[in-house]
């Protein structure tokens, strides 16, 4: 469990919802109307061209390795977020998210030639923000949601008396002769 938790760092896995919130704040600071499709398209095109946001060319909250047509988690979450945004009087903010989702799908599909779906990270940061949760808790919440699954996988491994899973890899390093520890002449065998 500790290894799983420690693996969560950065915008690709665990921190993407924070990047979405930051992207939306950046969008609002660079356009007059963040619900206007034309202005949003111009901004997102600049993001893709690495001329806006963090210069990485990524529209955060878009795309998934498995869910290419639609992320069912995002579909469900969108409904909850819409309801809460109405309760909180954040309809315009919700409209911005919907506009960004629509335009980003169009731009990314045109660029890649493949359908691109919004993922669960797109809406989760907005939800956490509406619930007044500190950004420092976004990744731990991401982890908590997965702990039952991680535990179930571990229980399956133990219950099936299965072999240790080892990822396949091919070493690309030049072969070196074995040197017994007693023969080391420097503090490190790599020196």
Question: Across the structure, where does each feature detected by a protein language model lie?
Answer:
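Non-transmembrane, aqueous-exposed alpha-helical and coiled segments at domain scale
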Residues: 1-186
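A short, hydrophobic C-terminal helix/tail in secreted or cell-surface proteins
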Residues: 187-191
